[in-house]
């Protein structure tokens, strides 16, 4: 798993932890300068789909993706690592991204608390996940019915328009793809 640090925006933290109503909201805004977040990145196995319905202009998309059990365990491993980093930095509590507002108050209880969230129907869907696909959403292929761009990166629907970024990569890169993208360009 990879980690990225940075100050989380108040909106992101409120959405993740439901700290946006009444007294909780006031307390959160007063204490916001003491909050931080780590993003846990992990490769997935690419079992997602983007469904488009309606006309090209004004239509709608629906994104469908589910985490496998192995990915769920990898994500929990990343949560444990992030929690340890926060406690080592002096955090008094670590909030897990769950709908139940689960928190750990010491590094000694962290593993048990993270492990209490199971993959089963309630576990997987109790996690608040923010997902992005930095790569792989512009499928390359010889069949225009199954791909967005041809084998040379030209968009099937727009002659002369070429894609030359990380969206052409067939899977998530574990290393930074800057040189690969430069070669594609």
Regions picked out by a protein language model, each given a short descriptive name:
Residues 1-86, 131-136, 156, 163-171:
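FAD cofactor-binding and catalytic pocket of flavoenzymes
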Residues 24-26, 36, 71, 80-87, ...:
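Domain-level signature for respiratory redox metalloenzymes
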Residues 179-185:
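An active-site-proximal "capping" alpha-helix that borders the catalytic cofactor pocket
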């Amino acid at each position: 798993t990879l980690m990225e640090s940075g100050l989380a925006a108040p909106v992101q933290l409120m959405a993740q932890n439901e700290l946006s109503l009444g007294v909780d909201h006031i307390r959160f805004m007063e204490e916001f300068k003491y909050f931080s977040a780590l993003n846990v990145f992990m490769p997935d196995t690419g079992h997602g789909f983007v469904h488009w319905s309606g006309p090209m202009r004004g239509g709608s998309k629906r994104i469908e993706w589910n985490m496998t059990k192995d990915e769920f365990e990898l994500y929990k491993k990343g949560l444990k690592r992030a929690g340890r980093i926060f406690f080592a930095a002096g955090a008094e509590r670590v909030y897990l991204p769950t709908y139940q507002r689960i928190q750990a108050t010491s590094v000694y209880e962290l593993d048990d608390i993270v492990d209490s969230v199971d993959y089963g129907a309630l576990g997987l869907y109790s996690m608040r996940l923010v997902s992005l696909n930095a790569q792989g959403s512009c499928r390359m292929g010889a069949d225009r019915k199954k791909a967005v761009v041809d084998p040379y990166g030209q968009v099937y629907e727009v002659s002369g328009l070429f894609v030359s970024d990380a969206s052409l990569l067939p899977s998530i890169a574990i290393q930074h793809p800057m040189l690969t993208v430069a070669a594609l360009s």
